[in-house]
Amino acid sequence: FVRDYMKWIGHSEFGLDYRIINPSNLLYPNEKEFNHWLEQWYLTYKSVLELSVKYEEFYLIGYESLCGNPKVWINVKDLLGINQETKYLFKETKKVIGQTFDNNLSDKCYRLYESLVSKSFGI
């Protein structure tokens, strides 16, 4: 059921039905390599950043902010007009990845991440 459900709602970004989100001009087309996933992250969130510039009513919400500052969740609820008391325990986990990776690509990702954070709502 889970696999069918994920197909029905269009999730193919990982798992058995994985399809590359950004297939053009890849430096790392092999999905078994860590750099492939890093590159896909970069290409996906680069598009997200471009959308946030293009559309005024586009809000980025940093998960780390949700985890580290309960006021962020209150601000999100206020923005959406949610008056109901809903409590979520957002928990940030930090995983040390013991993989080798392309340092230039990693640096590009980090700079993009910093740009996303600087445009995040609710900080």
Segment roles from a protein language model:
Residues 2-123:
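PAPS-dependent sulfotransferases, especially Golgi type II membrane carbohydrate sulfotransferases
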